[in-house]
Amino acid sequence: MRSHPDFQTPWAQAIIQNPDNKFVVEAAHKQYREDTVTNSMFQYSLYTERGIKAHLSFYRPCKEPDAYLGTESCLLLSLGDGLDGKAGRVHGGFSGLVMDQVCGSCAHNSMPPPVILPPATATMTVDYKHVIDSPGLVLARAWMIEVSGRKLWVKGTIEDAKGNLCATAKTLFVAPRLTAKDLEARL
């Protein structure tokens, strides 16, 4: 997927070729088994030729001063006109959806073991800074800023290829309580 035509711009290539990246998912579309609902909104509704045309998911060192663990989760997305709220502009609600996805991934992958179930979004505040053009490329980033018991706070941003900060978010995730049955199932 790193060779997807939409990712051949100098901006995207500078991101992709960073040697510190640890790529997780490289897919244009289908990445989960057909018999599961895992991430079904993205899987069946958004990963289309006019929606999210291509995406890369990766981790890398985070340079934000408030990064709790020193790493960030990233999504590089190629967006089509099927995500528009107004012609040429991605629907504002899509920013919230992407923030929940990238921040949730960060929270889930930053949880201490044993990780059995992903954390749930408790609150999310999204500040919209700039419209996202479509078609276009964006980079969503998220990093953990605090952990307290089962509570995980994460910050995130969406930036476009023109250098615009399009949205910021602060989220609170709550890790599930683990029962003895949950732990036994893991053995």
How should each PLM-predicted stretch be described?
Residues 1-134, 146-187:
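Terminal targeting signals and extreme-terminal segments of soluble enzymes
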